[in-house]
């Protein structure tokens, strides 16, 4: 039997003051969110039109016009509203809140009397509601709107959007299920499941938990459900999804019987996020065991070193074990965000540092690589190798442009990244009655109810420096509790001191946390020194794309080589195994502040022999190479880039 062993503390209990993420949050709150707001209102020229606000006005009857955009365009606005809710918790903004309230009023006017809410089917094809669960994303949009409703209520105390979402989910509950008179359908794109669990936890209404359980349990019962639906209907807005195998939508077998991550990577992450939450709520060990197996398969065989998941453009999907191509990697930003959701739920159910290690990898690498440093351009995909001008993908899609752009036709990633970064404080700490867990070394202060009330301040220069200090302020002197500090998987040596006195290594648990149990006095300090030397990292021998190659890592940061620093044709470079890796001083004026690495390498001379093939190996010259953090690449113009270098 399992249960939630710990719970992440509320965003309102955390104040981030961090040398790295304070800048990121400031950019998101003061630049990215306003920029996205203008995009949603179609006020930014030279980019893809959104039309989402106009779609709601048309659906509400406020103006005449024709629906424009993807069938799931509503979700862009929902995710932006959710990000706004978190930003209001981080930093009050009455003007932004008033504009969000006006948008919520608009959403309420668009909602139908029976609770239905989807602007495409309200404005364009009302006769076809709920006829294409495969790819028309009505429940996907409902899920994102529900997440926004919960977040906005928790941030502001206002219930209007929450009430709209309850009415919407009640409508879905009346329609779907195994009871007589209901439809035994499931959504093609998971999202409603995790949203229903959040709605249940916010309202206490059991029907929402039961509906989430129905959608999770029903998936995979009939692997041909979506194909049967396609064959039965005479109408379809698109038949793209109709051709996908059941595994694409994780419908190939019941969730409890699945043991590998399959299909569309984002859908899979959203499903597993909901499944772990449900398993912990229901004490469902069988469901939890399946989630653990899929986590292990993902991390051990199907994840890029940057945290990216999804190896192929076709279906934005997982493929097979160890298939991790670099120049055609998909590694969608939304998928990396989804891994964070999954990891957070796994940590609540089982506070094991291996889940926090992946969460950390994502927030410092695979997620924020999706945003330009100024917050106004975005990557949909996150390749590990870029060769501008080369036809590395056969599809010609804008997602594969090796340069961030201002918006996308399918703009799911920009607001998804915004809601993750504005809610980051809720990923750092969790607590139980007698234990406080420090999962991420993100600086700031946090308040806990543990042991009668505790406040902890964390200070550091992380991720550029491995020194971290906790200052503990219990409300009651002598309060007894355990402070659990993560021992990162990348760290080979970590020293922990309490009030300057070394702590015995015996307190480190097999789940990767230093368990510091004591009677705490106001002003007690815990200082951690983590060895942070640059390291070479090698892929599993079965990863064909990385054979004979090496990547560089320092602390939680994965590094990459850009043409800006090292010239083009990065494939002609190699890093000898004996070459020493030098850590350069922190450069505040480079890429908003980074620590770069320098290493002596070799470059093959290409002009000596012009023959395409020759008997003699190319001559080499010694060169000095510089590596920068992967997340910061492509912020100095379109350029060549490579994470895995020949050795």
Where are these regions (language model features)?
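Beta-strand-rich binding/interaction modules
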Residues: 478-499
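Solvent-exposed loop and edge beta-strand segments that line ligand/cofactor-binding
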Residues: 3-6, 60-77, 128-141, 174-189, ...
């Amino acid at each position: 039997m399992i249960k939630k062993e710990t719970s992440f503390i509320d965003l309102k209990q955390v104040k981030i003051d961090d040398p790295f993420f304070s800048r990121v949050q400031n950019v998101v709150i003061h630049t990215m969110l306003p920029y996205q707001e203008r995009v949603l209102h179609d006020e930014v020229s030279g980019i893809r039109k959104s039309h989402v606000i106009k779609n709601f006005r048309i659906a509400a009857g406020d103006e005449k016009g024709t629906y424009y955009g993807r069938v799931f365009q509503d979700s862009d606005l929902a995710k932006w509203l959710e990000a706004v809710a978190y930003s209001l918790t981080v930093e009050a903004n009455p003007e932004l809140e008033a504009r969000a309230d006006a948008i919520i009023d608009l959403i309420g006017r668009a909602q139908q009397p029976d609770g239905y809410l989807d602007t495409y089917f309200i404005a364009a094809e009302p006769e076809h509601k709920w006829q294409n669960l495969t790819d028309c994303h009505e429940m996907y949009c409902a899920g994102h709107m529900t997440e926004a409703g919960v977040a906005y209520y928790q941030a502001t105390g206002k219930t209007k959007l929450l009430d709209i979402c309850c009415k919407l989910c009640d409508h879905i509950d009346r329609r779907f299920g195994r009871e007589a008179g209901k439809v035994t359908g499931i959504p093609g794109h998971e999202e409603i499941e995790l949203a229903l669990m959040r709605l249940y936890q916010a309202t206490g209404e059991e029907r929402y938990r039961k509906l989430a359980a129905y959608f999770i349990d029903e998936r995979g019962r009939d692997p041909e459900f979506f194909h049967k639906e396609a064959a039965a209907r005479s109408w379809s807005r698109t038949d793209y999804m109709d051709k996908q195998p059941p595994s694409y939508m994780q419908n190939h077998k019941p969730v409890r019987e699945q043991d590998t991550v399959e299909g569309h990577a984002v859908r899979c992450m959203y499903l597993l996020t909901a499944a772990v939450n449900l398993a912990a709520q229901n004490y469902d060990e069988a469901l939890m065991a399946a989630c653990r197996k899929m986590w292990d398969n993902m991390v051990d065989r199907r994840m890029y070193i940057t945290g990216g998941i999804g190896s192929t453009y076709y279906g934005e999907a997982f493929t097979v074990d160890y298939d991790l191509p670099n120049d055609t990697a998909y590694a969608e930003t939304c998928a990396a965000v989804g891994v964070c959701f999954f990891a957070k739920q796994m940590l609540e159910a089982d506070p094991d540092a291996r889940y926090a290690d992946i969460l950390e990898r994502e927030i410092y690498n695979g997620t924020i690589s999706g945003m330009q440093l100024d917050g106004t351009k975005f990557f949909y995909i996150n390749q590990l190798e870029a060769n501008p001008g080369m036809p590395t993908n056969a599809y010609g899609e804008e997602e594969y442009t090796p340069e961030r752009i201002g918006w996308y036709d399918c703009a799911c990633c920009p607001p998804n990244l915004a809601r993750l970064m504005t809610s980051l404080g809720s990923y750092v700490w969790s607590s139980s009655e007698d234990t406080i867990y420090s999962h991420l070394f993100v600086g700031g202060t946090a308040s806990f109810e543990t042991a009668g009330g505790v406040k902890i301040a964390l200070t550091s220069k992380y991720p550029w420096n491995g020194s971290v200090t906790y200052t503990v302020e219990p409300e009651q002197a002598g309060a007894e509790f355990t402070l659990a500090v993560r021992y990162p998987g990348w760290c080979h040596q970590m020293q922990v001191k309490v009030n300057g006195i070394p702590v015995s290594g015996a307190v480190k648990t097999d789940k990767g946390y230093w368990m510091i149990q004591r009677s705490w006095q106001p002003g007690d300090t815990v200082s951690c020194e983590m060895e942070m030397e640059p390291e070479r990292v090698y892929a599993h021998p079965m990863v064909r794309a990385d054979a004979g190659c090496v990547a560089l890592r320092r602390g939680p940061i994965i590094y990459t080589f850009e043409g800006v620093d090292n010239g083009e044709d990065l494939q002609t470079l190699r890093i000898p195994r004996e070459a020493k890796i030098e850590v350069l001083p922190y450069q505040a004026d480079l890429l908003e502040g980074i620590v770069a690495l320098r290493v002596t390498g070799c470059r093959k001379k290409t002009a000596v022999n012009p023959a395409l093939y020759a008997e003699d190996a190319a001559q080499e010259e010694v060169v000095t190479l510089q590596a920068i953090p992967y997340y910061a690449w492509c912020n100095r113009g379109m350029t060549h880039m490579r994470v895995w270098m020949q050795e």
